[in-house]
């Protein structure tokens, strides 16, 4: 799994497969750490040969490590410093401001829960298996997990993503490729397909089992945001393969061919047509005493993309309405400001047509009413000490969403 604190891809790929390779046999047998490690190393070596054969490549020397769930959370599920913690708290305010998280939930805790679900992880040329979550005696699922992880070892480094949406697109290529390789291995092994578990058609060796009940449950919205690269990414990579085999997949790692938006992942025809995000400006504020906060990627603004919009709307509306209202996304500019203990963020979204802009405007209006926020009857709402505003510029086919702890900062006259 390609992930970082705050759910982003890092330059040194951290890749993981989810809890799901634990079997009843392991629970009853409970092998010693020595037997466990010997078995894991055995199928690890077998999987390495399989990846080299399937991809017609040679993998570098790769080391296998056995760690505990607590060690995994300490390594990848906690902030790396004060700035990282600040970014997590800002992101939590964004999620809550857009009603993606209830007020009593913690994004810090969600990060740890996400890591606690991992079964294996890859960092550079080192692969880690989490003993509580991974059963090397369950075949062929366990070997398929190593095929997934070893694919990450092979994958070339991608250009550093500048935005949230670009990061999700890059991660979809990385995780989609690794998940597709796991499927290729399973087909070669001629194993019986495992019935659908809990997330679309992803094999259970990448999903939680009944043991995941011991893990603090993640919010559906956060799970859907972060599972997108595995689910939709595999479908995207399968489409690449159908257009030219592994050569087309390999080409996608080259600069100029790497997917840049979640829209391209959802609609591969837009990838092949090289339809990228349109540049969108941030609105000018009426006051200049707000401090611009850079993103965790060092940028002055972010882009959240079509998939994020879809998940936000689907949290309150039916899935078909959310999908239809997010289709037609053309680009967006998300800018975050602070002033003392107050915050303001603006989200200027460009749409392909006036109809697309209208559909989102209506869907967002209905979403806000569904949240129980107190509205003024037009385009302003208040909830939990935050004020939310939406505007539709029919001349530019844009919609502006603004959220702030300061009511005067979300008035229509505040933005130009």
Q: Across the structure, where does each feature detected by a protein language model lie?
A:
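Post-HExxH zinc-binding segment in Zn-dependent metallohydrolases
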Residues: 154-210
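Short pre-active-site segment immediately N-terminal to the catalytic Zn-binding motif
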Residues: 127-146, 165-170
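Acidic helix-start/capping segments at beta-turn-to-alpha-helix junctions
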Residues: 60-80, 165, 170, 197-205
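Catalytic glutamate of the conserved HExxH
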Residues: 145, 149-153, 157
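Pan-zinc metallopeptidase signature
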Residues: 217-341, 348
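Catalytic zinc-binding patch centered on the HExxH motif and its immediate surroundings
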Residues: 73-87, 104-128, 136-137
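Secretory targeting signatures
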Residues: 1-31, 51, 416
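C-terminal soluble interaction/assembly domains
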Residues: 341-416
């Amino acid at each position: 799994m390609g992930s970082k604190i705050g759910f982003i891809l890092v330059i040194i790929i951290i890749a993981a497969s989810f809890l799901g390779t634990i079997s009843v046999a392991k629970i009853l047998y409970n092998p010693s750490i020595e037997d466990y490690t010997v078995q894991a190393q055995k199928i690890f070596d077998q999987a390495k040969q399989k990846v080299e054969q399937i991809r017609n490549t040679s993998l570098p020397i790769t080391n296998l490590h056995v760690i505990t769930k607590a060690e995994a959370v300490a390594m990848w599920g906690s902030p790396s410093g004060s700035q990282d913690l600040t970014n997590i708290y800002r992101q939590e305010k964004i999620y809550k401001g857009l009603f993606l998280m209830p007020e009593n939930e913690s994004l810090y805790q969600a990060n740890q829960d996400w890591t606690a679900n991992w079964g294996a992880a890859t960092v550079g040329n080192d692969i880690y298996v989490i003993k509580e979550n991974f059963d090397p005696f369950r075949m062929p699922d366990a070997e398929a997990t190593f095929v997934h992880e070893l694919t990450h070892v092979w994958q070339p480094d991608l250009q550093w993503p500048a935005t949230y949406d670009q990061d999700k697109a890059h991660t979809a290529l990385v995780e989609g490729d690794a998940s597709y390789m796991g499927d290729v291995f399973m087909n070669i092994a001629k194993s019986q397909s495992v019935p659908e578990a809990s997330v679309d058609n992803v094999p259970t060796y990448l999903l939680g089992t009944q043991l995941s009940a011991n893990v603090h449950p993640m919010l559906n919205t956060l799970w859907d945001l972060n599972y997108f690269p595995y689910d939709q990414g595999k479908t995207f990579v399968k489409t690449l393969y159908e257009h030219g085999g592994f050569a087309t997949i390999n080409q996608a790692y080259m600069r100029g061919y790497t997917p840049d938006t979640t829209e391209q992942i959802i609609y591969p025809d837009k990838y092949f047509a090289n339809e990228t995000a349109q540049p969108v400006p941030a609105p000018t504020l009426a006051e200049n005493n707000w401090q611009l906060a850079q993103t965790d990627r060092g940028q002055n603004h972010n882009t959240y993309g079509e998939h994020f919009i879809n998940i936000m709307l689907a949290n309150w509306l039916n899935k078909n309405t959310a999908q239809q209202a997010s289709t037609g996304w053309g680009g967006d500019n998300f800018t975050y400001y602070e002033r003392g203990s107050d915050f303001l963020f603006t989200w200027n979204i460009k749409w392909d047509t006036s109809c697309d802009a209208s559909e989102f405007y209506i869907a967002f209006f209905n979403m806000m009413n569904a949240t129980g926020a107190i509205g003024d009857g037009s385009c302003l709402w208040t909830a939990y000490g935050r004020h939310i505003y939406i505007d539709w510029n029919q001349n530019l086919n844009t919609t502006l969403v603004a959220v702030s702890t300061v009511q005067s900062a979300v008035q229509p006259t505040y933005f130009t």
